[in-house]
C-alpha cells in the first residue's frame, strides 16, 4: 500500500532555491532522471553543471536541450566522459574532477543499469560493477575535492546515490555466504541466473548498506560532506528497458511518475544538510529503508559487505577508502 500511495497520491514539491556559485556533477545525465535533475539545477542558477555520460554525443544533445529550455549561458554546462563499467574510466573522470574543478558542491551518482541478462563488467556481474563498486569508488575518489570545498568555501557539500525502494524486494540469499565471500557469491553466474529478478534489487540494497556504513564510521559532526541515497520511485526513464515482461510495462504505464517529477527527488536529496547524512531519502523527505536494513541481521550483513567492498576498492586504487 505504501508504494501505491507514494506513486499515485504523494505530491512532490517543485524544486526551488538558489544555486548560484555552485558546481554540480550528475552521472547518467544524458537522459532520464539525471538530465531532468540537471535541468532543474541549471534553471535555479547553478554556475557549473557537469554532465557525466558514457556517450559524449548524447551528452551534448542533452546539454543543448537544457540550454534551450533554461536559456543559460553556453559555458554553464560541460559534458565529460564517464563509463561506470570501467574502473579506468572512473579513475580518469575523478582525476579531472579533482584537478579541473575549483569546487564540487553537489554530486549526484545517478548512473545505473538493470540488465536483462547476466554479463560481466570488470570483475563482477555488470550491475554490481556499475551500481555498487564503481559508484563507491567514485565517491571515494572525489571525496578529497568535496572536503576541500567544505573547508575553502565554508559550505557542506552533498554526495547522493540514486537508489530504489526495490532494495527491499529481495531476501538477499547470498548473505549466508562465508565471511569474505558475499560479493563473490553475488557475482557467481549460476547463482545469479537462478534468482535473476533479485539482482537489480540486490545492487540497490548494497548501495543502501554502503551509505549507512560510511555514515556510521564518519558521523556528520566529524565529517564535512553529507552522503545519502535517494529513492525516486518508479519513473518513466531508460532504466528497465531490458526488462521483457509485459507485467512490468503495464505497472510502469499506470503507476510511473513522469521523469521530471521523479527528478525532483534527486534535486531535493542533493540539497539536504547533515540531518540526511547516511539516510535513505524518499518522497522528498527522510524515509525508512526496508526492515531488513535496520534489523540485527541486516547490520551484521552490512558490516560484512562493507568490509568486502573496502578490500575491493583498495585493490583497485590502494588506500582510496581512507578518503572517507
Swiss-Prot record:
Q: Keywords assigned by UniProt?
A: NADP, Oxidoreductase
Q: What class of enzyme is it?
A: oxidoreductase
Q: Where is the active site?
A: 163, 200, 204
Q: In which pathway does this enzyme or protein participate?
A: Secondary metabolite biosynthesis
Pfam families this protein is in?
A: adh_short
Q: Which residues bind NADP(+)?
A: 33, 58, 83, 110, 200, 204
Name a GO molecular-function annotation. oxidoreductase activity
Does this UniProt record's set of keywords contain NADP?
yes
Cite the EC number: 1.1.1.-
Q: Which family does it belong to?
A: Belongs to the short-chain dehydrogenases/reductases (SDR) family.
Q: What does this protein do?
A: Short chain dehydrogenase; part of the gene cluster that mediates the biosynthesis of the dimeric xanthones cryptosporioptides. The pathway begins with the synthesis of atrochrysone thioester by the polyketide synthase dmx-nrPKS. The atrochrysone carboxyl ACP thioesterase dmxR1 then breaks the thioester bond and releases the atrochrysone carboxylic acid from dmx-nrPKS. Atrochrysone carboxylic acid is decarboxylated by the decarboxylase dmxR15, and oxidized by the anthrone oxygenase dmxR16 to yield emodin. Emodin is then reduced to emodin hydroquinone by the oxidoreductase dmxR7.
Q: What is this protein called?
A: Short chain dehydrogenase/reductase dmxR8
Source organism of the structure: Cryptosporiopsis sp. (strain 8999)
